[in-house]
């Protein structure tokens, strides 16, 4: 789709690391839609999914615990997500000044003491000269909700999820950021008892993010006898998408400037690509549970990592063999069988050449834990055909 931009707009687009043809391609997708994934079949146990026995889980946990002491292990946490969606319904109530009798307001009132932010909210609200006891049980509850969400109070609607009080314990509350400190200490501890955590954050919240992390770091290092190495990055603006009007024309803000919106989490692959580690655990900032429930998480994370290390060892050995010697037909079949059965690689021929095998093996290995499909929304594992005709197992 051809779009006319002014010279200043072209300079603005290029300064962000993008180009006019790339922006035009985005608008073509808006107009014509995106092609559907060519799903061949759902992945099932034995066909894309490996189901570990209890003995295998114990074995791979042991593999990981023995080898992790000599490895650089990184926890990669996409953390730029704002909390606005969590409070969308409440924000609508504040914006429209009601209705106070709505179900969401009643639920908020009934459950207010169960929220991790309750004490902070009440303290801040009363410090502002308000009466909590009278307002929580009257129409003035809307003022409490506004104090929770807006800049004059806790500003939760505009903060990233990482900075919210997330979980309540008997003697403390924790943010989602702190829960990632705990998780890292439990399963992402590498050599020299070092836990590397990398957070992707939005530029406007970077300073607040760093301030919270640094203020809590020493406390959790002492509590779990680890050393945290923290790093941060922001999403590359070149991956942003130009907003469009309903007429599929470039959207301009109230100052007349083009408005770009951040891409989805898939855009963070570039951030990940710039990091170096032997093993990388990937987990969203809000995908954490309380520490008293964490044992299953630790078990399966370690088992997955141990299985990854076993696959790596086999794959690396086969790659070295491919590089250094001329393989026999039987050796090629052995390696191809490993790639098909263990790495879910589909070859175009039942008798792949040595070079084809090496090309398929020479790539990162990703292990994804699967949960039983019980009708919940979200992606799932499928065998997918790409435009070039190749078939691979993907999360769709």
PLM features: residue spans?
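Beta-strand/loop nucleic-acid-binding surfaces
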Residues: 394-396
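N-terminal regions that are enriched for targeting/export leaders
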Residues: 1-45
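Domain-scale recognition of functional cores that engage charged ligands
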Residues: 10-13, 39-86, 91-374, 384, ...
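Acidic, two-metal ion nucleic-acid-processing modules in DNA metabolism proteins
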Residues: 381
């Amino acid at each position: 789709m051809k779009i006319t931009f002014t010279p200043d707009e072209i300079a603005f687009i290029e300064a962000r690391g993008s180009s006019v043809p790339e922006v035009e391609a985005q608008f073509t997708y808006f107009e014509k839609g995106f092609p559907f994934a060519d799903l061949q079949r759902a992945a099932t146990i034995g066909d894309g999914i490996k189901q570990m026995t209890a003995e295998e889980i114990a074995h791979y946990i042991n593999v990981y615990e023995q080898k992790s002491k000599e490895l650089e292990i990184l926890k990669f946490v996409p953390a730029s997500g704002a909390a606005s969606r969590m409070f969308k319904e409440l924000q609508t109530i504040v914006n429209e000044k009601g209705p106070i009798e709505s179900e969401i307001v009643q639920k908020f009132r009934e459950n207010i003491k169960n929220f991790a932010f309750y004490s902070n909210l009440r303290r801040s609200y009363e410090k502002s000269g308000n009466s909590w006891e009278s307002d929580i049980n009257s129409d003035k509850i809307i003022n409490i909700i506004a104090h929770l969400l807006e800049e004059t109070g806790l500003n939760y609607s505009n903060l990233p999820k990482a900075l919210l009080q997330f979980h309540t314990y008997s003697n403390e509350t924790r943010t989602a950021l702190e829960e990632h400190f705990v998780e890292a200490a439990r399963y992402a501890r590498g050599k020299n008892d070092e836990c590397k955590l990398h957070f992707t954050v939005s530029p406007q919240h970077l300073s607040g993010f760093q301030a919270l992390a640094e203020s809590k770091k020493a406390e959790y290092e002492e509590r779990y006898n680890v050393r945290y190495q923290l790093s941060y990055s922001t999403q590359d603006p070149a991956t942003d998408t130009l907003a469009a009007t309903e007429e599929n024309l470039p959207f301009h803000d109230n100052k007349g400037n083009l408005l770009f919106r951040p891409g989805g989490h898939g855009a963070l692959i570039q951030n990940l690509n710039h990091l170096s580690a032997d093993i990388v655990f990937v987990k969203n900032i809000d995908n954490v549970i309380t520490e008293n429930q964490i044992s299953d998480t630790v078990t399966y994370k370690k088992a997955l990592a141990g299985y990854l290390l076993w696959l790596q060892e086999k794959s690396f050995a086969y790659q070295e063999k491919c590089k250094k010697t001329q393989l026999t037909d039987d050796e090629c079949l052995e390696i191809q069988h490993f790639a098909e059965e263990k790495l879910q690689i589909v070859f175009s021929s039942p008798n792949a050449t040595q070079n084809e095998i090496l090309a398929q093996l020479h790539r990162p290995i990703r292990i994804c834990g699967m949960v039983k499909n019980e009708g919940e929304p979200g992606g799932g594992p499928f065998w997918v055909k790409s435009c070039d005709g190749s078939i691979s197992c993907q999360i769709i």
